[in-house]
Design a protein with these regions (language model features):
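Amphipathic, non-membrane alpha-helical segments in soluble helical-bundle scaffolds
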Residues: 5-13, 39, 43, 89-93, ...
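Solvent-exposed interaction patches of small proteins and small membrane subunits
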Residues: 3, 7-10, 34, 66, ...
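Acidic/histidine-rich alpha-helical segments that form the ligand environment
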Residues: 15, 78-117, 131-136, 144-146
């Protein structure tokens, strides 16, 4: 927990480095590979993370701090799928990393009582900033897992030869 009482900041701060480690050996072709037409590629996951960082989480952070009981609409990631297609994975990652660094700096500068700020989410009801930060960490970890599975399937499964049969990948 951060000095100001906000949860999850260390994990949120670590996410870009974890992702960088996972994608470091991917080519552009690897990053654009999709296990199925309806599934995301690594590049699309990175674009989604970048978009969510600025257009969901940061906007909500600002409203948590500027308004009394702001009302939030549910976020519909499916609505933005077209934005993610054809993105440059390096650009998407760099944008995500820059935005995350800015957001962490902002979060670390919030006052001690910020965790208890309340908003009204139209789907989930009353939520606190601390709860949103925990959801943000859940979101990060889900996409870290997703990227890891995509990298495993694209980059390493074939090279494992017959031993790959003992792994049940779900990219």
């Amino acid at each position: 927990m951060a000095e100001n009482g906000l949860p999850c900041l260390d994990l949120l701060e670590a996410t870009p480095g974890i992702l960088r480690g996972l994608i470091t050996e991917l080519t552009g072709e690897d990053a654009r590979w999709k296990p199925a037409p309806e599934r995301f590629s690594v590049a699309e996951v990175l674009a989604h993370l970048s978009h969510s960082e600025g257009h969901c989480y940061r906007m909500r952070l600002d409203r948590f701090m500027a308004e009394t009981r702001p009302e939030f609409e549910p976020d519909d990631a499916q609505m933005y799928l077209d934005l993610y297609r054809g993105v440059d994975p390096d650009e998407a990652f760099d944008q995500f990393e820059d935005q995350r660094e800015t957001n962490i700096e902002f979060l670390r500068g919030l006052p001690d009582n910020a965790a208890n700020r309340v908003a009204l989410h139209r789907e989930f009801g009353e939520i606190t900033l601390a709860q949103m930060l925990n959801e943000w960490a859940l979101h990060d970890l889900g996409h870290i897992r997703q990227v890891a599975e995509l990298v495993r399937a694209r980059k390493y499964q074939a090279g494992a030869g017959p031993m790959a049969a003992s792994y049940h990948l779900k990219p």
